[in-house]
Amino acid sequence: MADMKKTCLHQCHVDLGAQMSPFGGFDMPIQYRGIVEEHNAVRNACGVFDVSHMGEVDVKGPDAEKFVNYIFTNDVTGAPVGQCFYGMMLHPTGGVVDDLLVYKRGENHFFLVINAANIDKDVDWILSHRNGFNVEIDPLSDSLGELAIQGP
């Protein structure tokens, strides 16, 4: 397990007694008190999940919207700030590079959330398509933590 990456919350999970397991190259919490109890908590109240293993990429600049539309299957044109989209990045032949979430953070500013197991591949693919677009692309995966709050 020496090669496993750890999220910024890893030690907190260990200290709280989480059952840890490899997932996407990270040592991640799988459960605390039991799957059934945790499932019921999410279905009836609220669950908090450490998703810090996911990859994050900032896209900013005058061509940010145009660039995101170029690499992403959904049209983000004119989306309000705060809007989130789920879709895919595709190869020119139609094969899937990866699925991802795209958030509009501001005018000419988008935030991409990519899958943990594909961070390096996806970032390289995104960077390889920036030519001709006036954008800044900033991989943030090593500097952010991320929590997902889920429930009814």
Predicted segments, located by residue:
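Basic, glycine/lysine-rich polyanion-binding surfaces/domains
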Residues: 1-152
